[in-house]
């Protein structure tokens, strides 16, 4: 599609329903707002906004943030709304694409007409889906690392990057180390963590207890299981980061967080929305469909059950063949063909993903291969 790098998908943790990236427009000048992953706003005064290209805005953001040249490869400009995400090519004109947003929603989403009419995208400066994650840890600039860290943290907290409990606690401990003071055995950290737990752990791991026991626990009481596990993980991080009494630089903790995220299969992915057939249940019951997220990176494809938040399928590109079809008057389909070991001989499998973004997913897979 003209206007994207194939990385169009469902919105992530930074989605906002009442944002706009054009705060005012004069005869020649305009105030453009570009959002960072941590919700910081970068205001830009630009001229000839309708003809301005993404590359020019990208350079302006880098200049304001005083980022090194490597940021040109690491980050990209995205148009983001609650309904759709689009990574822009350098030659794209963001203002023009913003005006075409309803057409993009109709083409690539199944959103109701009322939602399409109300939706408005904003500009975001965030990770380029085509930047190899192996190069990140070689970056010396602390501000670049911080921006990558903030984006990864947001994806973990929003459960977009699925993690087991142990990984979530280890990542949460690194966030504690960045945000809070040095751990001390007599520090009343349980209270502090209890109040800020959703800043360190995904929502499903930090739901506060309900009822009488929660009321009796009080602010000065002992930490609950989630808080205590996070405290224990935080203490381990502190012990590792202290070297002869000298605290490690923030860049070290950013790298540690990113390195941990690199082990997650979803890091650096573009996310798409689709549906797959449910297995038929019983003689008279039709299977129906279930909603899925399709995560595509430079390394492979993962299909995630959107409701249950678990991985249905994970494949490296060497393990699959793919195609997409767009039958007339039917939903486009992305086909994934792969082998699975049945215990004796490999069995050929075929997964059918119904999605208006099938063509985009196919194009991204082709690019990555």
From Swiss-Prot:
GO cellular component, one term: cytoskeleton
GO biological process: negative regulation of canonical Wnt signaling pathway
Family annotation (SUPFAM superfamilies): Second domain of FERM
InterPro entries from the UniProt entry: FERM/acyl-CoA-bd_prot_sf, FERM_2, FERM_central, FERM_domain, KRIT1/FRMD8, PH-like_dom_sf
Stretches for region Disordered: 1-23
Listed Pfam families: FERM_M, KRIT1_FRMD8_FERM_C
Protein name per its UniProtKB record: Putative FERM domain-containing protein FRMD8P1
